[in-house]
Amino acid sequence: MRWLIPRLGTFAQAHPNITLHLHSAGGPLDLATAGVDVAIRRNDFFWGHTLAAEPLADEWIGPVGSPASFDTPHPKQLHTRTRPQAWQDWQRATRKSPIDANTTTPPFEHFYLSLQAAGAGLGAAIGSVYMVSDELDAGRLIAPSGFVRDGSAYVALAREPFAANPARETLLHWLRSALAESASKWISRETQADTRDAIP
């Protein structure tokens, strides 16, 4: 939602005949009961064998914070309960040294709260390039170490193949294009090539 909502106007202008109704949810998927046509999720859980799945984009993560947060060489590390291994995933991908426990803080309940705290100058959080691209554009956040793949990806899920529904397929192609555009501003081709080999 953090990434999608600011871009809904662009989608509506390009596709005025398609109306999107958004639902924010997590946990087990039951698209039929929820009345949902398409779910956007990370592929870090098992969704069963009955759903059609289409890849959207690899996940790219990196430490982000306000410019002032990085005035110190070791800003406090912000954690979240919904992505408890985020710092470890980044360290694995970059082969950085282990976390110094003295620079950590109690975890936030949700991922987006840790990003909000990072923007408020409370420390550095591991951010998804998609979730923070607008803040990076505006200069509210910086990412001194750049971004690396964490081994996960975003997928679009539906009850039937996307090609069976023109509106659903249109949304799929738009999501892929918009995600790629967001990432391309902050991830160079050289970085993509280097980090593809770094993820086991």
Locate predicted features.
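Ligand-binding cleft/hinge of the Venus flytrap
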Residues: G9-F11, A86-A101
